[in-house]
Amino acid sequence: MHGLLLAAAGLLSLPLHVVAHPQPSTSLAGRGVDLDAYRMADRSSYMSSDDMKLKQPAIASLSGGNYVDTATEVVKRMMPGMTFRMADDHYVGESGISHLYFRQTMHGMDIDNADFNVNIGKDGKVLSFGHSFYTGPAPDRAPVEKRDFSGPMRAFHGACKALNLPINADKATIQTMNEHEVMFVGTSGAMSDPQGKLCYMAKEDGTLALTWRVETDMGDNWLLSYVDAKETDKVHNVVDYVSHATYQVYRWPIPDPTEGKREIVENPWNLKTSPFTWISDGKTNYTTTRGNNAIAQANFDGGEDYLNNYRPNSKNLKFEYPYAPNMSPPKSYIDASVTQLFYSANIVHDLYYMLGFTEKAGNFQVNNHGQGGKGNDFVILNAQDGSGTNNANFATPPDGKPGRMRVYIWTKAKPARDSSFEAGTVIHEYTHGLSNRLCGGPANSGCLNGMESGGMGEGWGDFFATAIRLKPNDNRNANYVHGEWVNNSPKGNRLYPYSTNLQTNPLVYTSCNKYNEVHAIGTVWCSILYEVLWNLIDKHGKNDGPTPVFENGVPNDGKYLAMKLVLDGMAIQPCKPTFVQARDAIIDADMNLTKGSNKCELWKAFAKRGLGVGAKYDPKNRTGSKAVPKECQ
């Protein structure tokens, strides 16, 4: 195979120079390309704990041996005769659930969008599983035997042309990485050397396509483009690791600078979740905004370099710099901006760690100090990023590669406003990293690229930002609007406020039928989760402190319990989940964590907004339901 790749590359190393406008956009709109048209379909199935007992009792009764053997047996029984491999990112989560991930193979190559995840409960029995394995006709011969496909350089050319990417490959050469993967060396315009991988892809029409997966990190978009290996001018699907948004933002825990004053905090880290503090990686102690979890700096030109960019430095570790909302221009308070961004991101790291986003779950750290997972992947935090305005985004590559958060200046007020000072931006964007690492496993960052699954990615960000900002006197009548301060508008930037009042916010599951945009769908998902939040708070009370209190591994209040169940559900659900599957995963998370003691509170919350027992997913005609199980009526 090495010889075949190199031979094809040598014949097809065509000069390439594609020019595009460097305008950031979630859809490459500045280059005339709509990425939504290339989204993968949400095609996973999910077998919940309750469904499995009824439909697959033999699977439900599996136990004994180790969890790897049990999970492998599930895949063998459910998919007899199919070939697959186990990913190396399986782990036992903080809730005691073992999460294992498998990838379907064909003729020794991955089917890149065919995944199977199995969840083994604390009792050693199968809790649930989900999959998107391909079950259609298989090619009778391996492509390497027929040699009827084009080489990687032609596919690279096809991806750049179809997506109008500003990459110059006039002097590009191909470097073979392994049997099926190559690197394009000598290009310019991308933030790192593009890569190619020969793999299959299951198409929406039920057939299988041989593709070159071309990976290009363009900064505002980090793309996996599945180019047909025979017709290289055809791009089947595109996954974007970058999640873009314009969100409600607030300073931790203050919603925005209008609701509080800046104060000096001393040693704000939690040594249980950041044992090296925030300004050390266990090997080097820093006197700047750099540590094990994150590295923060100015990025005025919007470029890819960050190590050499400006960041405040204080030998006496006093990161105390002036800032007021009426200061202008933004560069005049860059020290305060970088410091605030660094503080907020580290706070989120520590909180999510407590809730279960640890090293083995794929969190963002340089030094995992022997706790599992892959290190060398802190979050790169770019303050006042010059690549855009009125936005923010987060790039989530697989575990072991740094995440990248860009926060911009907002120009909807005078003077302009810096979103580093609203922690909601950081919470929302960081949550993209959380959900992309948990869903499908730490090694698979492409599980939330469908329209409904991508919408949930946005909704989870809103949910965590909203739950964290709850005030001590709030009750279920509290309404929250996203984006008031940065947008300079009391209506914010969402369709409706988050509310438990159906007149204030009428969104239900079937509202998604009229939306074809991830932020709108995300607003529906967060509206549903907001009902979950208040049902659990009404039952268990609300901890207004900055961190959860656990009793036997379970948060003892409703707010943090809701956050914990939603986070656990991310790890349980299948790759490219639907609302229905994510609902079932949250209910299964509660079954594992509390033995189902909150089952009815959860079902009633989901049913209130149309995601009850009879809800069914169809991308164009979802069916709503307000029904709950008999035991909850």
UniProtKB/Swiss-Prot annotation:
Glycosylation sites: 285, 592, 621
Co-factor note (free text): Binds 1 zinc ion per subunit.
Cellular-component GO terms for this entry: extracellular region
Domain of life where this protein originates: Eukaryota
Annotated signal peptide: 1-21
Needed co-factor(s): Zn(2+)
Protein EC: 3.4.24.-
Localization, UniProt: Secreted
An example Gene Ontology molecular-function term: metalloendopeptidase activity
Residues annotated for Zn(2+) binding in this entry: 428, 432
Pfam family, one: FTP
Main location: secreted
Keyword Glycoprotein: yes
Entry keywords, A to Z: Glycoprotein, Hydrolase, Metal-binding, Metalloprotease, Protease, Secreted, Signal, Virulence, Zinc, Zymogen
GO biological process, one term: proteolysis
Matches recorded under Gene3D superfamilies: 3.10.170.10, Neutral Protease Domain 2
Function noted in UniProt: Secreted metalloproteinase probably acting as a virulence factor.
PANTHER family: EXTRACELLULAR METALLOPROTEINASE MEP
Family named by the database record: Belongs to the peptidase M36 family.
Name of this protein: Extracellular metalloproteinase 5
Protein's organism: Trichophyton rubrum (Athlete's foot fungus)
Gene for this chain: MEP5
